[in-house]
C-alpha cells in the first residue's frame, strides 16, 4: 500500500509508522536503539519512497520529503533490526541521456548492511521489455517486489570483548587465499550445519590447519553480497567465486549458518574475532570496479535505478551504453564524488565496524582510471592516502584490468602492495625449463626491486604467488598443459589459454610412478621457492594438500566438489602437507628470507669479506655477465648473508640470522655443485630438499666440497660453522 499520511491507514493495510525528518548522514539505514534513520543519495530523483516490507511481504510506502544535497532522508521511531526495506526512485527514464529511473523496481540500499531473500529472474527485474526488439523502449513497469531481495535493518551492537587486530608486519605476513564455502564445505570435523559458512571458517579445525601452516592472514574471496546471474542459473551453475557484488556493506547472506534476516553480520564478526584470537588477520577481496547489474541489458537492482549517471561510467558518444574495463558489462564511476564516498565509506565500515585488517582490490586499475588512462595520482588514491582509517590497513592491488593500458604491475603508490603477476609467470617458467629466465628469476627471488624500489617501496610490496583462485591449482599446474573448462558451458573458450604449465609428460591423471614423482617434486619446488623469496608470500587454499580442479582453470561458476577443498587429501597427500609446513616454518624461523630492505649486492660493513647476497655458478665462483647471458643455464646458487641484514628490528636492534645457500637446479639432469670457499662458510648443513617427499635431508658439507643436486630440485643449506 502507499500513503502520504504517516501514522494513518487508508483502510487497505497497516498504519504507517511515525516519520521524523531525520538526517542525511550517515547514508543507509542506521539503528540507534530507539529507531532507524534512512537516507539515500540520488541527484536525478524527483521523488523517493522508502518501502517497508512486513513478514507477509506487504509493502508500506513512505515518501522521503527531506532532501539535503541530493540526499533523501527520514527517521522512523520504533523501526528495529530485522525490518526489511527498499526504495523506489521516481525520475526520468531516458536511456539516451543516461537516465534509467524506474519506480516499479524495489531498489536495494547501496549502503545496506544486510540483505534477505533471493532474486527470481524474469521481466520483473528488468526496466525494458525483455521480448522487445528495442531495449530502450518505455519500460513495462512490472513490479519487482517479491522477485528481488530486500535490504534489512541490522543491530550494530556486538560484544567484541578484547578483540584486537594482530597487525602483523608485511615482512612477517603469510597470506592464505580462501573461499568461505570451498574451504569448509567438505571438512568431516565441521558440523554439517556449519559447513560452507563464516562459522565453519572459524571452527578450531580450520584455525589449527592455518596455524600449522604458519599462515598469518586469510584473504577471503568476495564476501560482499553478490548475485548469481541468470545466464549461469539457466545452465545449472552458480556465481561461485562471488565477483558479482552489489552490496558493498553486507556480508553475503548465504554464508551464514542461519537464514534469519541480518544474522550474517553477527556471524561474520564472530568469525573475525575467532581468527584474531588465533593471531590471523582477515583481508577481504573487494570488487569496487563493477556491480552485478551488468550492461544495458542487465537487471535493475539498485545503482542503475537510483542514479545511473552518478554510479556508472557511460560511453561518451552514446550514454545508453556502459564503459567496460572489467569484462563484466559495466564499470563503477570512481570519478564521481558520491561513488568515491560510497567506496571509502564501505572500506571504513569494514575496518571500524567489522574489524577487518585489509583489502585486496579486484582489477584495481579500473579504480585509477580518470578519463581513459590509468592514473596513479587519481582521486581514489588521494582519498585512500589521506584517510586516517583506510590508510592504516593492508592495501593489496590486483594491478590490472581488461582495458587498454590496464597492466600496471609496479605502478601503484607507496602505501600499496601488489599481486606480482611477473613473479608468478617467472617462477612457473623457470621450473618448467624455459630458456633465458635465470636473470628474471633472480629479480623475482629477491623482491622485484626493478618494480618497487624506484617508488620507495620495499620487498614486501611484492605479493608473491605461484597460483591463485584464477587459474590452475598447483597440482593442475604440473598435471595439465591445457585448460579443460568444458563443464563451464562455454565450449572451453573461457579461462586463460596460456598457463605456463607443464604436465610432466602426460595430460591429466596417470598411474606412472615416475611422472607422479616428478609432479610432486615440481610442486615442492614452487612451494619452497615461494617461501625463500623476498616479499610477501600468498598461498592458494588447498595447494598444501594437492587440490585439483581436473584441469579447469576458471571455476568461477562451479559450486561443487570440483572447486571445494577435498579434505581427504590431507591423508592421501600427507607428505606434501608435511613439506609445506616445513617450508613455511623455515621462513618463519629465519629473518634472512623476509628482509625489510632490498639487497645491495655489496659488503655491508667495512672489513666484511662477502656481500649481503652473492650469485654463484655450480662451480662455486661468482656469476659474471657472461654467465647471466647464457640463455640455457638453469642452475644457480644463491648466498644469503644473515649477518648483513641492514634493517633493524622493531626496537632498533641489529638483526642477525643464519646464512643460507640456495642451490637451484631446473635442468632435467643432476648437476654437481661445488661449495664456495671458506670466506662464505666452513661448514654447511642441509635444511630443506625438494627431492625428498617431506623435504628432509641428512647432509653436511664443508667449503669447496662437491655434491650433487638432483634434476629439477632445490636444496637449502644453512651455515653451521
UniProtKB/Swiss-Prot annotation:
Active site at 362 (nucleophile), 398 (proton donor)
Per the record, the domain of life is Bacteria
Q: What class of enzyme is it?
A: hydrolase
Kindly list any coiled-coil regions of this protein.
none
* Swiss-Prot/TrEMBL site (Transition state stabilizer) positions: 470
Pfam families referenced in this protein's UniProt entry, alphabetically: Alpha-amylase, CBM_48
Spell out the molecular function terms from Gene Ontology.
glycogen debranching enzyme activity; hydrolase activity, hydrolyzing O-glycosyl compounds
Name a biological process GO annotation. Answer: glycogen catabolic process
| Keyword Hydrolase on entry | yes
The record, for InterPro entries, names:
GlgX_Isoamylase_N_E_set, Glyco_hydro_13_cat_dom, Glyco_hydro_13_N, Glyco_hydro_b, Glycogen_debranch_GlgX, Glycoside_hydrolase_SF, Ig-like_fold, Ig_E-set
Q: Which UniProt keywords apply?
A: Glycosidase, Hydrolase
EC number(s) on file: 3.2.1.-
- Give the UniProt family note: Belongs to the glycosyl hydrolase 13 family.
Please give the name of this protein. Answer: Glycogen operon protein GlgX homolog
